[in-house]
Amino acid sequence: MSELTLTQANEQYVHEISASRHEPQWLRDFRLKSLNLFSKLPAELSYLYTKYADLAGIELKSTSLHLPEPSQAQTQDVLSKLRSDRAITIYQIESKTILPDIPDALRKEGIIFTDIRTAIEHDPELFRRYFLEKAILPEDDKFGALNNALFTTGFYLYVPKSIEVTLPFRHVTVLDSEGSGLFAQNLVIADNRSKFTILEELYSTRLTGQTGRSTYSGLSEVHLREGADVTYASINNLASNVNVFSNKKSIGARDSRIEWSSGLLGGAYTRSRVESVMKEEGASSENVEVVFGAGTQRFDTVSNMSQIGPNTSGHAVSKGVVKDKARLLVKGMIRITKNAKNSRAYLAEHGMILGKEARADAIPGLEIETNEVKATHSASVAQVNDEQLFYLMSRGLSEDEAKRLIIVGFFEPLVARVPVADVAKRIRRIIDLKWSGVYDFAACLKTPAFEDEYYEEGHKTQDIFEGHYKYR
């Protein structure tokens, strides 16, 4: 296959992708439709957010659609740092995919965890069914359409009925090459009453010093059948030259539950969309999002909840801190339809600004079509509290140390709610290193022993923002 840039991603290139992978005609047609929509759709579909859409400097045009093969030394170095015996892991290192060793006991239960290409080849009819009933349609989002057209990596996970898996399923992506694009699509099927955890980790081993812009595009769908319970934790610590486009969406059947948690810490420009659709009665969703921007980083995040069935519940909280010249835009919408009687929803968006050149905006929204529901939302953007700063400095701390403690205290009530301990530890570590101006891949993976002891002791935190809301 010839090496192409994103501006050359045309119908011929899509045909080349499909032909090289021996894909069925319906998937090729789906890719072509998606590519056509990408060229036509605006960056922002909602009139509420159109004026905030800002893609200046994204530089997608020069992105190469050819991922290099990593060297053996690079592969071994990554594996030595990221290998874990406490998870079932797929590694995506540049263009190289390393599949997991699934324990025999789980394999006999019918669990499937493999890369998306292998899954499509083995069971094309299954994928035809889900692609024709996709959660994230090409027409829903410009960059979702681009992913649907160009994806070449990703994972497929199926957990059968009534199976509870204690080991997490882990997907680790490492993107180091300059000017390259990696497009991953993930499909998760949680059958009736299944329960499991997914860890999605994005890293660059060289966090600074690169100039050529790279692109990471990830699209994840979680289909929850009756009574299914899924935890999906993700962390983004990609390099300062990577543009990140992330779309995640779940469809929840009766009494299902999903818990999202995201640490958005890396990248040059990050555009993140998380949506939970509670389609049937009793479905529930929780979404926790932590953002820390420094330098010239830009973050544009969305947390949406669509409650269609009665007696559903949704809870989404996002917190972000920006320093230097960083920018943060946090958006979210609660939609409760006319049939969603007795439903409950809460949406909170809070930003903290450090410095005169940083900027943050929070835009929560409500669309409610019925009575007998409870929907609350809160939003705040502020500088560091001068009284808190003065108090800490009067106790002997420097201004820098005092601000660091205030930031830790701002984030911790939310980080403490991240359901996967290893992810929570890594988020804390990266926040601390970013505050100190240290950008070292190996250091990000290590947690000082005293921090482990402190949090394992179960110190309680209180979120002072939880009481501030608008009520309906």
Regions found by a protein language model. Give the residues of each.
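N-terminal amphipathic, basic helical "cap/leader" segment at the start of enzyme domains
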Residues: 1-140, 144-145, 295, 323, ...
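Conserved beta-strand/loop scaffold segments within soluble protein domains that form the structured core
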Residues: 20, 105, 109-390, 394-397, ...
